[in-house]
């Protein structure tokens, strides 16, 4: 449960779908890598990107509402709560699924820790409370 909400576990086909990540730091990098692993068409928006940031379409600028047009889902992973809240509001107006890296309680979705074994995918979620614990559980063989 996130903030008292039980979240519905679901597997989404994002192959070829536009997914936008706002942010250019470590958290955004992890989210981008996860989306790429599942075949998403990723656009990242940030005035600055950390060294080694994945090679995706980059909008090197401050966020604006037009950046999420036609997105299937959006992840707000900036280090600025106000910007993340603006992204949330813009996504909600457009009926776009949105995840706030700093506010799982108000997010439409969270990305669980997942491991693929051929045709089997195992996902573990602590509902945003302890991503490190979910990662440890996922790594149990």
Give residue spans per PLM region.
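Adenosine-phosphate binding glycine-rich loop
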Residues: 13, 115-141
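Alpha-helix C-terminal capping/helix-to-coil transition sites in glycosyltransferase folds
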Residues: 69-71
């Amino acid at each position: 449960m996130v903030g008292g909400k039980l979240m519905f576990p679901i597997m989404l086909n994002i192959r070829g779908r536009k997914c936008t990540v706002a942010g250019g730091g470590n958290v955004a990098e992890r989210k981008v890598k996860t989306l790429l692993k599942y075949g998403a068409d990723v656009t990242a928006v940030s005035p600055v990107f950390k060294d080694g940031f994945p090679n995706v379409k980059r909008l090197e600028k401050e966020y604006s509402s037009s950046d999420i047009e036609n997105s299937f889902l959006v992840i707000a992973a900036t280090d600025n709560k106000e910007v993340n809240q603006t992204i949330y509001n813009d996504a909600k107006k457009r009926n776009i699924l949105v995840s706030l890296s700093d506010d799982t309680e108000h997010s439409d979705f969270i990305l669980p820790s997942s491991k693929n074994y051929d045709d089997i995918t195992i996902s573990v979620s602590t509902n945003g409370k302890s991503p490190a614990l979910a990662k440890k559980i996922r790594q149990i063989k």
